[in-house]
From Swiss-Prot:
This is Calcium-dependent protein kinase 1. Ca(2+) 1 binds at D380, D382, S384, T386, E391. It comes from Oryza sativa subsp. japonica. Residues 1-10 have a biased composition (Basic residues). It comes from the Eukaryota.
Length: 518
């Protein structure tokens, strides 16, 4: 279940992770965060300036104020660029959303709400700041703080050593964001490690929450029914389509579990399997490294991951927990090095597997995809060879599929491997074919041979780089990280057995001693 909005900017290569600055003292439960600042009015527009249909104010040319540089990231609805303020020379990130992609009223409302929420939350140290919003005839442009310090997990991995105390400091910053959001009537709904970036490469850089595209305003006791979020981090009540802001606490608890162990608490070979595990609620505290982790840490995780949302700790109660406090009980001894290794693998593995599954889909016989080819043709109404979001939106109901708007967007994001905003034939097949067919031995062999260009029986670093770059799937550093993690015999290349283990999710390095539950 992917999130349905575009990603925020990703920064340059990461530096060793910082020891984050402490958050406000947890005993200040009733602390009032700074009042939301009113957005700075845009410069006066010409008398005949047209009104923007998204922001509802006179259109402005963002390029008159900012110089656009390189692309930083790309998502379903837009592209994020590095921009420079012409008058001051200061650098920012600009999320540019093409208005032609905002085809429905809900799309427009989502962008408006994202702008409103980011302005509303302005002033918090751990929330990325929106500096301005501009609309012209082609796009809505959101100017934001530039986060150049890298993703949360990346910096931990780069450092290579880590302690419970460091995990507690990071968790404090994450929960402080939740506390501020909830106290100001905002429900984030998509808390996950990828949505936390460090502002700078310095050791004391603050951690910043980004991407409020799924966030909503809420009142105490209000419940929601739409299925949103990301599979590993989604709360059980969200899957039951009756949930409130307590779901943010669950997501933060999942992040804390991963910070301490390197793997998610609810793990399976498919998204449906993950959802079943979430609903069952069994949390593994017996496998390594949990026996050596403090009781205080385990106590907090358990209280954040209670199945009944009413029994979960509130953000204020978490900040007062003895383990997480700045002067609290979290020990400073390093966590087992395998935690870093497993975290690295969890972050990197899916990219290679997604490409491999697409390769498998491209080699399936007509017999194996009976019905799927015709379904693709019926959805591809303009015969372009690709399916757009609009074609999915209009075509699925005609096929008898009852699916919500948010689920349609999630399907698009999950299936769109190369991130170009459309689903091609192979992407469609790999997303809709039952996994047991994709994992047949002969299909995996074909995928392996696709990467093994010289038929040596091994996939080398160069072969992997060549194949993945065709799909724009990561930089050299990430590619080398992937091969290092899949290469369990450490000979610098991937043999067929290692490739099969990766495809079938049986790699013991990912989930040691974890029993199959499905």
């Amino acid at each position: 279940m992917g999130n349905r909005t575009s990603r925020h900017h990703r920064a340059a290569p990461e530096q060793p992770p910082p020891q984050p600055k402490p958050k406000p003292q947890p005993q200040q439960q009733q602390q009032q965060w700074p009042r939301p600042q009113q957005p700075t009015p845009p410069p006066a527009a010409a008398p005949d300036a047209a009104m923007g249909r998204v922001l509802g104010r006179p259109m402005e040319d963002v390029r008159a104020t900012y110089t656009f540089g390189r692309e930083l990231g790309r998502g379903q609805f837009g592209v994020t660029y590095l921009v420079t303020h012409k008058a001051t020379g200061k650098r920012f990130a600009c999320k540019s959303i093409a208005t032609r992609k905002l085809a429905h009223r809900d799309d427009i409302e989502d962008v408006r709400r994202e702008v409103q929420i980011m302005h509303h939350l302005t002033g918090h140290r751990n929330i990325v700041e929106l500096r301005g919003a501009y609309e012209d005839r082609h796009s809505v442009n959101l100017i934001m703080e530039l986060c150049e310090g890298g993703e949360l997990f990346d910096r931990i991995i780069a450092r290579g050593h880590y302690s419970e105390r460091a995990a507690a400091a990071l968790c404090r910053e994450i929960v402080a964001v939740v506390h501020s959001c909830h106290s100001m009537g905002v429900f984030h709904r998509d808390l996950k490690p990828e949505n936390f970036l460090f502002l700078s490469k310095s050791e004391d850089s603050p951690l910043k929450a980004t991407d409020f595209g799924l966030s909503v305003f809420f009142k105490p006791g209000e419940h929601f029914k739409d299925l949103v979020g990301s599979a590993y981090y989604v709360a059980p009540e969200v899957l039951k389509r009756n949930y409130g802001a307590e779901a943010d606490i669950w997501s933060a608890g999942v992040i804390l579990y991963i910070l301490l162990s390197g793997v998610p608490p609810f793990w399976a070979e498919s998204e449906d399997g993950i959802f079943d595990a979430v609903l069952r609620g069994h949390i593994d505290f017996s496998s390594e490294p949990w026996p050596s982790i403090s009781n205080g840490a385990k106590d907090l995780v358990k209280k954040m991951l209670r199945q009944d949302p009413k029994e979960r700790l509130t953000s204020a109660e978490i900040l007062n927990h003895p383990w997480i406090r700045e002067d609290g009980e979290a020990p400073d001894k390093p966590l087992d090095i395998t935690v870093i290794s497993r975290m690295k693998q969890f972050r990197a593995m899916n990219k290679l597997k997604k490409v491999a599954l697409k390769v498998v889909a491209e080699n399936l016989s007509d017999e194996e995809i009976t019905g799927l080819k015709e379904m693709f043709r019926s959805l591809d109404t303009d015969n372009s060879g690709t399916i757009t979001l609009e074609e999915l939106r209009s075509g699925l109901p005609k096929l008898g599929t009852k699916i919500s708007e948010s689920e349609i967007r999630q399907l698009m994001e999950a299936a769109d491997v190369d991130g170009n905003g459309t689903i091609d034939y192979a992407e469609f097949i790999s997303a809709t074919m039952h996994m047991n067919r994709l994992e047949k031995e002969d299909h995996i062999l074909k995928a392996f041979e696709y990467f093994d260009k010289d038929h040596s029986g091994y996939i080398t670093v160069d072969e992997l780089e060549e194949a993945l770059k065709k799909y724009d799937m990561g930089d050299d550093k990430t590619i080398k990280e992937i091969i290092a993690e899949v290469d369990t015999d450490h000979d610098g290349r991937i043999n067929y057995q290692e490739f099969v283990a990766m495809m079938r999710n049986n790699n013991p390095e990912i989930a040691p001693n974890r029993r199959r539950m499905f």
